[in-house]
Amino acid sequence: MSSKYPRSVRCCLPLWALTLEAALILLFFFFTYYDASLEDQKGLVASYQVCQDLTVMAVLGLGFFTSNLRRNSWSSVAFNLFLLALGVQWAILLDGFLSQFSPGKVVIKLFSIRLATRSTTSMLISMNAVLGKVNLAQLVVMELVELTVFGTMRIVIYNIFKIDYGMNMMHIHVFAAYFGLTVAWCLPKPLPKGTEDKYQTTTSPSLFAMLGTLFLWMFWPTFNSALLLNPIERKNAVFSTYYALAVSAVTAISVSSLAHPQRKINMTYMPNAGLAGGVAVGASCHVIHSPWIAMVLGLVAGLISFGGAKCLPVCFNRVLGIHESHSMHYTFGLPALLGEITYIVLMALRVFWASSNMIGFQVLLSTGTLSLAMAMSITSGLLTGLLLNLKIWKGPHVAKYFDDQAFWEFPHLAVGF
């Protein structure tokens, strides 16, 4: 017999979502208008192609990437689309209001959609840590809080540290990963015996997760270069991301076979380590001028991701009390920290080679922005986790974790689904 979505949530979720959408429509009506400037057709087409690539990554890539659980795949794909559609609207308004201090309407350009899509990606990453343990109403609340805090953080970095929007977006993986992990830490942790089958993977869901990985792998160079305005930096970002992804993919397959007693490849670790290179190189891809640096970074990121996914879950699940079924920490968190540290080292070396006495200031600046991103992600994640624990949201009971039957109608419910 299928589990029932709580009556209170069944009543309030449509009302809550439609009311929020109506409020967004009113805000767009009163405070926004389209950019009326005449752009050349070639530039417009190129800009739209970047938006299209980012949307494919978010919808297909991240949607299927989290569909590896046998009883939670429907929610993974559909909730991802819902949150992306809602989050882009909120992010466009938020970025417009925060970036202009004088009163006036927000001008919507293709770059605005590009920036909003990348900002919303932070929520789609964080969602991996809590997916299956919260309902859709809780995810909407989590999204509104995270996008607001993330947008505020970028404005603070822009105004205090004088780092433009393209550069301060490099903290997205660190912020998203540790925001999501902190929220997951606040949620009810014990999983009752007998429900382990719900968060086990099977062949078909794992294949869909690998399909999402392929979409992410193909379009990750666009993701890392989407907000860079300097043509040279954009070219460096594309090249560096490709080489880092290539090496991390080779590393994922090779190390997976090496670690298996019978030298077989384990599909479980492929999505994690295969993408780790793109995550790790994201912070420094625009300042890397030689392929070998990106390749070494991809190799180390792949090893860290594989080692973390294979050895650290016991520590996370039992010691820290964080049950993380989608390996988000090993795909985004640890590789992103490696990338941030690499960026700090590269910037320090650049200043040193230039015979400048500003090396200490540059290291302090880079370390300060990373520390701010970590502090704001953990603090806001803690507050969000406490907010999601309120009974008003009617979160799913631990016995109903990772179960699509709590949210979806199945025309013919098969035994053992």
Swiss-Prot record:
<dbReference type="InterPro" id="IPR002229">
    <property type="entry name" value="RhesusRHD"/>
</dbReference>
<dbReference type="GO" id="GO:0097272">
    <property type="term" value="P:ammonium homeostasis"/>
</dbReference>
<feature type="transmembrane region" description="Helical">
    <location>
        <begin position="265"/>
        <end position="285"/>
    </location>
</feature>
<comment type="function">
    <text>May be part of an oligomeric complex which is likely to have a transport or channel function in the erythrocyte membrane.</text>
</comment>
<protein>
    <recommendedName>
        <fullName>RH-like protein</fullName>
    </recommendedName>
</protein>
<feature type="transmembrane region" description="Helical">
    <location>
        <begin position="287"/>
        <end position="307"/>
    </location>
</feature>
<dbReference type="GO" id="GO:0008519">
    <property type="term" value="F:ammonium channel activity"/>
</dbReference>
<feature type="transmembrane region" description="Helical">
    <location>
        <begin position="172"/>
        <end position="192"/>
    </location>
</feature>
<dbReference type="Pfam" id="PF00909">
    <property type="entry name" value="Ammonium_transp"/>
</dbReference>
<feature type="transmembrane region" description="Helical">
    <location>
        <begin position="125"/>
        <end position="145"/>
    </location>
</feature>
<keyword id="KW-0472">Membrane</keyword>
<dbReference type="GO" id="GO:0005886">
    <property type="term" value="C:plasma membrane"/>
</dbReference>
<keyword id="KW-1133">Transmembrane helix</keyword>
<feature type="transmembrane region" description="Helical">
    <location>
        <begin position="12"/>
        <end position="32"/>
    </location>
</feature>
<dbReference type="InterPro" id="IPR024041">
    <property type="entry name" value="NH4_transpt_AmtB-like_dom"/>
</dbReference>
<feature type="transmembrane region" description="Helical">
    <location>
        <begin position="203"/>
        <end position="223"/>
    </location>
</feature>
<comment type="similarity">
    <text>Belongs to the ammonium transporter (TC 2.A.49) family. Rh subfamily.</text>
</comment>
<dbReference type="InterPro" id="IPR029020">
    <property type="entry name" value="Ammonium/urea_transptr"/>
</dbReference>
<feature type="transmembrane region" description="Helical">
    <location>
        <begin position="238"/>
        <end position="258"/>
    </location>
</feature>
<feature type="transmembrane region" description="Helical">
    <location>
        <begin position="44"/>
        <end position="64"/>
    </location>
</feature>
<keyword id="KW-0812">Transmembrane</keyword>
<feature type="transmembrane region" description="Helical">
    <location>
        <begin position="331"/>
        <end position="351"/>
    </location>
</feature>
<feature type="transmembrane region" description="Helical">
    <location>
        <begin position="77"/>
        <end position="97"/>
    </location>
</feature>
<feature type="transmembrane region" description="Helical">
    <location>
        <begin position="358"/>
        <end position="378"/>
    </location>
</feature>
